[in-house]
A protein has these predicted regions:
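A structural signal for leucine-rich repeat
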Residues: 89-92, 119-120, 160-161, 199
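Short, well-ordered amphipathic alpha-helices
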Residues: 90-91, 257-259
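Structural signature of tandem-repeat unit edges
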Residues: 1-10, 20-38, 48-61, 70-83, ...
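Consensus positions within tandem repeat domains that build extended binding/scaffold surfaces
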Residues: 12-17, 40-43, 63-66, 95-97, ...
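Short, flexible coil/linker elements and helix-boundary hinge sites characteristic
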Residues: 91-95, 219-221
Length: 271
């Protein structure tokens, strides 16, 4: 492996770019050189036969196109990872994991938040397993993951049932055109904007259930607190079944143009 002279904790820029003979990388074995904390831009780009890598639990940073167009089909995201940078490829801004054949991602126990743009443009991604510890899906995490159709929490979690996620930020699932159903339980906020719709472009989405959260003060008064943001599900014409429960606010045009709201109104009273 190649390391930076100063810290010896970085797999350097383009270190193994287009090394087509590379098949497996075990970062844990590199600790004699220092804790591998950074995989730099294009470090493994074009390693089309790289099918196995162990992302060390010391890893904190993955930079642009680090694993672009590799043979990886499955990875586990360590809880130590705190930074991912996107980069431009083929005229689009994509995550370091795009351009290849990555089909399954598992987030390790202890991960509390996905990172912005983490798998953006990874069009091969089909399945994501989240830990119960994960509370926030950040902006554009799975944007344009057009093959994503299965989400679960834990090994025994129900398919497309997210019951521990509290916040979903703008664009998180925008362009996930293979996702057909989604159940959100105990969600406090679905952030969204008309220019970056959280579930925009989910053209196969047929059924959505959202159960909000309530808070109870010391007098016993219960208050609704969940908000569904502007244009969150707008123009998903296949979406014909929407179940909402204990929702405080459905923002402007949240469901406009969906199959159940062709007149342009928001189905805020649907339960």
């Amino acid at each position: 492996m190649e390391f930076s002279d100063e810290t010896k904790n970085t797999v350097c820029t383009k270190a193994f770019k287009n090394v087509t003979s590379l098949q497996s990388v075990e970062l844990a074995y590199c600790l004699a050189y220092g804790n591998i904390s950074t995989i730099d831009a294009s470090a493994f780009e074009g390693c089309v036969n790289l099918t196995d890598i162990n992302l060390s639990d010391k890893l904190t940073t993955i930079n642009g196109l680090a694993f672009y167009n590799t043979g990886l089909t499955e990875i586990t995201v360590p809880a130590s990872l705190t930074k991912i940078t996107a980069a431009s490829a083929a005229g689009k801004t994509v995550s370091p994991f795009a351009g290849g054949v990555l089909r399954k991602v598992t987030f390790a126990d202890g991960v509390t938040k996905s990172l912005q743009g983490m798998f953006m443009g990874t069009t091969s991604l089909e399945e994501v397993v989240l830990p119960e510890s994960l509370k926030t899906i950040d902006q554009n995490t799975f944007k344009d993951c057009s093959s994503l159709k299965k989400l679960s929490v834990g090994k025994s979690g129900g398919e497309n049932v997210l019951d521990t996620v509290e916040t979903i930020n703008a664009g998180a699932f925008n362009g996930c055109s293979s996702l057909e159903t989604l159940t959100l339980k105990n969600v406090a906020k679905i952030d969204s904007s008309d220019t970056n719709r959280t579930f925009g472009g989910c053209m196969s989405l047929k059924k959505v259930s959202v159960t909000g959260v309530t808070t109870t003060d010391n007098t016993g008064k219960t208050t609704l607190s969940t908000t569904i943001g502007t244009s969150a599900f707008k123009d998903n014409k296949a979406l014909k079944e929407i179940n909402l429960d204990t929702i405080k606010t459905v923002s402007q045009e949240a469901f406009r143009g969906c199959g159940v709201a062709d007149d342009g109104t928001d189905p805020a009273t649907l339960t």
